[in-house]
Regions:
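Non-catalytic cap/lid and distal C-terminal segments of serine-dependent acyl enzymes
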Residues: 1-249
Length: 249
């Protein structure tokens, strides 16, 4: 079982229709008092502010909690493993992203659409996450382009491997496997919205060569602004406080 957190605008009305933003690591979004590191995205404050300023369409935020023990296995783009030799894929991880996405699409979304007044169609449904949550957001867009109209991927963990194993040789191999997956499975260029970003401090300091190669792939496939955006935030690290600061960028 997973907790699912739902944030509604202060003026929510069942007579209106709302876009929906699905976010991973749901327990990290709203309340620093309950998170493991005493940080939060502050997504409720930021989205509320943007709504009050009429900068975004009326929306609901759905935060799907992670299970800490299986987070890496749940968020790793599972079909990218087909591009790796079996000899280097650990047999004890239990990669499970395809089941996680089925849960999101076949259980969570229908429940939200039934319980709340939502715009159900693809152009009103978005997915967002950071780090491994960035990977699973982009993977969700590739696997379910008929469900998600856009993905926001912050500080995406493009080396792919666990941070305590960040050997360059291994990261090069695993990140290439994901790019090969993207090359074959991305939606038609500019048919969906994809946002990616990174900082250059702490864990994000490892990301530039891998994000640059992914950016080059997107350009080669014809993705262009405003449907494709990749940003760098100098000095930014890999925490909820860092991501909060650029939510309204």
């Amino acid at each position: 079982p997973r907790y699912v957190f739902v944030w509604l605008p202060s003026d929510y009305s069942p007579k209106e229709k709302y876009d929906v933003l699905y976010m991973h690591d749901g327990q990290m979004l709203f309340d620093a008092n309950t998170t493991w590191n005493k940080q939060e995205w502050g997504i409720d404050e930021v989205v509320g502010k943007l709504l009050n300023e009429k900068k975004i369409k009326p929306c609901i935020v759905v935060g799907v909690a992670n299970i800490p023990e299986t987070r890496y296995a749940d968020y790793f783009p599972q079909k990218a493993l087909k591009n790796l030799p079996d000899s280097i894929v650990p047999g004890d991880v239990g990669f499970n992203a395809d089941n996680y996405l089925r849960f999101l699409v076949e259980e969570v979304k229908p429940f939200i659409d039934k319980k709340y007044s939502t715009n159900k169609s693809v152009e009103h449904t978005f997915v967002m996450g950071s780090s491994m949550g960035g990977l699973i957001s982009l993977y969700a867009l590739c696997e379910y382009p008929e469900v998600f109209g856009g993905a926001a991927c912050m500080s995406t963990h493009v080396p792919m491997i666990l941070s305590n194993e960040l050997s360059k040789e291994k990261a090069d191999q695993w990140s290439e496997a994901f790019r090969n997956y993207l090359d074959k499975n991305l939606p038609k260029a500019n048919s969906r919205m994809i946002y990616m970003d990174r900082g250059d401090a702490t864990l994000d300091a490892y990301y530039p060569p891998y994000q640059d190669k992914l950016d080059s792939l997107m350009a080669r496939k014809g993705w262009k602004t405003p449907m494709w955006i990749s940003k760098v935030f100098p000095g930014a690290g890999h925490t909820e406080e860092d991501w909060n600061k650029r939510l309204d960028n």
